């Protein structure tokens, strides 16, 4: 049996935890550069606020009650996600972090001591009392059925946020699947659901009763696996340790359009520096560094320009200095004056677990001395936050930095921002 714990309205809920005055208020969190609404609290959803609505439109709209908006506070959300993970691990033997707000749990054998749904309610209370966040819990003999159960626990309030689908109660499973639209099934996207609809498959139950061989022939092995999972055959195991990444991408839209080479070089240096940090976090080395730049495709009065260039190193590296140097060389090959650039990024590929490679007799490139020790010191100083020490190439206070004018304090990662309680 698997359980899926999903934090309700995660980003908005994190903002509410440290602001008791917002407990029953409408809260939304904005995307990068305070562009549009992404997460919404339950109260905001009741007001009819849609995901993706631009903030400038929402700001001038009239509602029966005020809507409080926050810029995305990624450090806070990552910290709170880790707290939820720790609390789940205190009650479950094996936990897989599927996303920042979703965790799969291995709950095999739990029912020999306690009813599955009673255990789900224990999980909810343990996380709520320890973090202030509310989770929904869905349980099933497969990951896909656990995901469907979790969907139903949100869809119908009578379940109290907890629902278990077991092999001993097939009628309940079939009833739920008959009510679940096919596009709500885990792993079934919009494109696949449209094709399924043309075949007369509109619900999860109809997909579960489809012939797996037919599904594999007309779609792919992934959807066939989904069909088997809907029928209680576990095909997707728990992954306590995530597989090694095959690519690292660091990119961001600019808060202000970039028009000068110097500003773009600073941005590329910052993205390369962050990508190198992530690479070392994966304990990997890379040989391929790419940089891309592009203008806004929506600026109808300006010509569009986008390009990408890459550099391949003779020796795999995880040294920020090497990665920045390669990224700047790539930028030099694609930079064109006269454009108003909206976005840039750095990509790392071709990973290896060691920095060893076979050099030719006349190769002049040699590994940097004490590179690993220097990077360890650098990462140690910057841990657990970012920006304590950085390379000068990224500048000091660039104007193009991402806009976060409504950013909440770093309640859990900065001493100065720890909330103070006063007794009166």
Swiss-Prot record:
InterPro entries per record: DNA/RNA_pol_sf, DNA_pol_Y-fam_lit_finger_sf, DNA_pol_Y-fam_little_finger, DNA_polymerase-Y, DUF4113, Rev_trsase/Diguanyl_cyclase, UmuC
Transmembrane segments: none
Cystine residue pairs: none
Any one GO cellular component localisation term in the record: cytosol
PROSITE patterns: UMUC
Signal peptide region: none
UniProt GO BP: error-prone translesion synthesis; SOS response
Gene3D superfamilies: 3.30.70.270, 3.40.1170.60, 5' to 3' exonuclease, C-terminal subdomain (1.10.150.20), DNA polymerase, Y-family, little finger domain (3.30.1490.100)
UniProtKB keywords: DNA damage, DNA repair, Plasmid, SOS mutagenesis, SOS response
Name of a matching Pfam family: IMS
UmuC domain segment(s): 2-189
Molecular-function GO terms, alphabetical: damaged DNA binding; DNA-directed DNA polymerase activity
Chain's role: Involved in UV protection and mutation.
Similarity field: Belongs to the DNA polymerase type-Y family.
NCBIfam families in the cross-refs: PRK03609.1 (NF002955)
Protein name: Protein SamB
